C-alpha cells in the first residue's frame, strides 16, 4: 500500500510548548498519526529539534518550520512509497536532511513522519503497533521505573539529582506493578503533607519538595514503601537518574551538588554513589557521570557495574555508533532509548539491537515534555525492552502510557510476560 499524503500541524505538549503532529495517509485512506516529545535536560550529541525562534510566537518555540517541511518537502518526496518499507522511508528522510544531526529538517520533523508511518502500516494490517513491529514473537511487558520525586531540570526545587524512582520488580504482572507504584505514590504524598512539605509535582508528575539533602529523597521514599506494606529491596527497588551533566563543571572537572554545598572529583563522586548503593536498595543509576567524563564512567563501571544497572542517557543519546564505542571501552551496562534523540524508528531499533547483542539492557523512555501519544508503550513491548520510564503516577501525559500498557497486557493474556527482577539478570 502506497503513501497518498502526509500532513502536519502544531499541537501543544505537557509543558505548554508547541510540538509536531504528523498524519500519514495511504491510498485506501488508512491514517497513522504521531506526536513527538521534547526534552529539558538534553545530551550534547542528540539529534537537533527544529524550532522557529520567532519570539513573537510561543516565545520562539513554535514549530511552523517543521510543519512546513512535512507538508512540502517530505510529503512531495515520500508520496508513492510503499508503507511496508519503513526503513526505506526513514533512510530517505535522513538523506533528504543531509546532516549528521538532522539539523536542516529537524529530528522532531523527521520523527513525526517516521512514527506516523509505523502507525499507518499497523492500521493497514489491522494490528496494534506492538504486534506490527514485533519480529521475535515474544512479548515482555516492561518493568516501570516510576519517577516519584523530581529534582534537577525537571522541578523548581533544591534537589540536584533529577529523578528518584521506584521499581516494582516483585509484582507478578504489569497491572500489579502499577498498583504497587500508585500505592507508594499516595503514601509518599501523605508523608510529605504530614511533614509540611510541598506536594506540587514536577514536569514528569513526581513530587518536588525542598529537602535537606539529596539522600533525604531516598529515605522518604523508603518510608513510603514501608508504609504501603511493601519490602524495599524485595518488592520494590530504587533507581536514580543523576543527570550529572547538569551539575558537572567542565572547567574545574568537578561535580557540584549545590543543595549540599559539596564538590567532588570524578573518583569522589563515584564513591559518593557507591555509598548510596551500599546503604540503600538501589538497582539502577542513570547518567551517574557527565556525558563527556568517560574516565569517570570507567571508574563507575568498574566499581558498580556488576551490582547496579548503569544507564547511559546523555552518554549514548540512542546513537548506535556512540554505544559501540562505549561497549568497546566497557562503559555502563544499559542504555536509555529515546526516539527523539536519534530521530527515526529505524535508527532506534538499530541501537536496541546493538545493546542486546552486547547484553546491555534497553529502557524505553519518555521525555519531560510529553503529549497524550502512547507510541513508546507499544515500542517497549515490540522491542522487548525490559523496562520503561514514563514518569510518575500523576499527569495524564504520563498515565496515558501506563494505561496503554494495561490494555496491551490484557490483549496478550497468557502471552504477556512480566520479567520483574529478571529484567536485571545481568547483575549479581
UniProtKB/Swiss-Prot annotation:
Keyword Secreted assigned: yes
Residues annotated as binding (2R)-2-phosphoglycerate: 162, 338, 367-368, 389
UniProt cofactor note: Binds a second Mg(2+) ion via substrate during catalysis.
Disulfide bonding pattern of the chain: none
Residues at the catalytic site: 204 (proton donor), 338 (proton acceptor)
GO annotations of cellular component type: cell surface; extracellular region; phosphopyruvate hydratase complex
InterPro entries (UniProt xref): Enolase, Enolase-like_C_sf, Enolase-like_N, Enolase_C, Enolase_CS, Enolase_N
Pathway(s) of this molecule: Carbohydrate degradation; glycolysis; pyruvate from D-glyceraldehyde 3-phosphate: step 4/5
Keywords carried by this UniProt record: Cytoplasm, Glycolysis, Lyase, Magnesium, Metal-binding, Secreted
Catalytic activities: (2R)-2-phosphoglycerate = phosphoenolpyruvate + H2O
Gene3D superfamilies: Enolase-like C-terminal domain, Enolase-like, N-terminal domain
Cofactor(s) it depends on: Mg(2+)
Localization annotation: Cytoplasm; Secreted; Cell surface
UniProt record similarity statement: Belongs to the enolase family.
Role noted for this protein: Catalyzes the reversible conversion of 2-phosphoglycerate (2-PG) into phosphoenolpyruvate (PEP). It is essential for the degradation of carbohydrates via glycolysis.
Subunit structure: Component of the RNA degradosome, a multiprotein complex involved in RNA processing and mRNA degradation.
Name of the featured protein: Enolase
Gene: eno
Amino acid at each position: 500500500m502506497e503513501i497518498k499524503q502526509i500532513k502536519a500541524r502544531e499541537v501543544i505538549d505537557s509543558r505548554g510548548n508547541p510540538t509536531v503532529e504528523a498524519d500519514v495517509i495511504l491510498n485506501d485512506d488508512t491514517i497513522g498519526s504521531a506526536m513527538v516529545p521534547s526534552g529539558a535536560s538534553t545530551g550534547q550529541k542528540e539529534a537537533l529539534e527544529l524550532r522557529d525562534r520567532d519570539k513573537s510566537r510561543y516565545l520562539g518555540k513554535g514549530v511552523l518550520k517543521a510543519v512546513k517541511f512535512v507538508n512540502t518537502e517530505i510529503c512531495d518526496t515520500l508520496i508513492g512509497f510503499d508503507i511496508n518499507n519503513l526503513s526505506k522511508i526513514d533512510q530517505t528522510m535522513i538523506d533528504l536532511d543531509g546532516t549528521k544531526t538532522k539539523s536542516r529538517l529537524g529530528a522532531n520533523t523527521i520523527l513525526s513522519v517516521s512514527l506516523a508511518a509505523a502507525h499507518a502500516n499497523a492500521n493497514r494490517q489491522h494490528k496494534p503497533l506492538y504486534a506490527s513491529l514485533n519480529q521475535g514473537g515474544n512479548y515482555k511487558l516492561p518493568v516501570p521505573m516510576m519517577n516519584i520525586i523530581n529534582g534537577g531540570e525537571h522541578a523548581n526545587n533544591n534537589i540536584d539529582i533529577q529523578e528518584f524512582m521506584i521499581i516494582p520488580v516483585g509484582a507478578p504482572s504489569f497491572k500489579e506493578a502499577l498498583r504497587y507504584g500508585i500505592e507508594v505514590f499516595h503514601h509518599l504524598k501523605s508523608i510529605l503533607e504530614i511533614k509540611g512539605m510541598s506536594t506540587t509535582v514536577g514536569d514528569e508528575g513526581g513530587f518536588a519538595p525542598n529537602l535537606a539533602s539529596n539522600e533525604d529523597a531516598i529515605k522518604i521514599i523508603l518510608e513510603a514503601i514501608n508504609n504501603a506494606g511493601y519490602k524495599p529491596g524485595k518488592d520494590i527497588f530504587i533507581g536514580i537518574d543523576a543527570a550529572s551533566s547538569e551539575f558537572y563543571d567542565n572547567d574545574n572537572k568537578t561535580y557540584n551538588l549545590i543543595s549540599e554545598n559539596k564538590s567532588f572529583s570524578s573518583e569522589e563522586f563515584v564513591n559518593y554513589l557507591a555509598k548510596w548503593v551500599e546503604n540503600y536498595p538501589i538497582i539502577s543509576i542513570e547518567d551517574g557521570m557527565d556525558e563527556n567524563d568517560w574516565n569517570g564512567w570507567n571508574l563507575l563501571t568498574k566499581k558498580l557495574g556488576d551490582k547496579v544497572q548503569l544507564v547511559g542517557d546523555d552518554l549514548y543519546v540512542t546513537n548506535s555508533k556512540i554505544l559501540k564505542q562505549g561497549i568497546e571501552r566497557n562503559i555502563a551496562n544499559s542504555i536509555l532509548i529515546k526516539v527523539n534523540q536519534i530521530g527515526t524508528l529505524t535508527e532506534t531499533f538499530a541501537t536496541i539491537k546493538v545493546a542486546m547483542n552486547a547484553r546491555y539492557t534497553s529502557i524505553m523512555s519518555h521525555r519531560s515534555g510529553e503529549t497524550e501519544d502512547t507510541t513508546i508503550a507499544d515500542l517497549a513491548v515490540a522491542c522487548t525492552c525490559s523496562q520503561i520510564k514514563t514518569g510518575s503516577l500523576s499527569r495524564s501525559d504520563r498515565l496515558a502510557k501506563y494505561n496503554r500498557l494495561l490494555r496491551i497486557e490484557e490483549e496478550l493474556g497468557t502471552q504477556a510476560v512480566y520479567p520483574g527482577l529478571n529484567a536485571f539478570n545481568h547483575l549479581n
